[in-house]
């Protein structure tokens, strides 16, 4: 399987990639290659977008949908993030946080 970055026209063979992670700055997807090198592959506007792009790549790898995965653009990720349901906030003990209003 290959991953492709439209903006830079970079293509990487996943057989040459040891790991994929959010870069140091927090707004990029970086690749750790089997040769020991690290390459910044794609830059995004936020860490949340970078994490979502990695999640999309992981889903594609898991399902084995295609031979080439094109890294999503920021606009596509923003739409996907906005459509996600809000997470329910729970206290560290696992209980819901108590609301202090209403009747």
Regions inferred by a protein language model and the residue ranges of each:
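Eukaryotic intrinsically disordered, low-complexity regulatory linkers and tails enriched in Ser/Thr/Pro
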Residues: 1-103
């Amino acid at each position: 399987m290959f991953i492709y970055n439209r903006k830079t026209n970079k293509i990487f063979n996943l057989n040459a990639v040891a790991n994929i992670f959010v870069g140091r700055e927090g707004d990029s997807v970086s690749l750790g290659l089997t040769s020991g090198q690290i390459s910044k592959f794609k830059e995004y506007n936020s860490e949340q977008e970078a994490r979502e792009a990695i999640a999309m790549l992981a889903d594609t790898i898991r399902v084995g949908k295609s031979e080439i995965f094109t890294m999503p653009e920021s606009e596509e990720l923003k739409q996907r993030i906005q459509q996600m349901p809000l997470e329910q906030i729970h206290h560290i003990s696992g209980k819901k946080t108590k609301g202090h209003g209403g009747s």
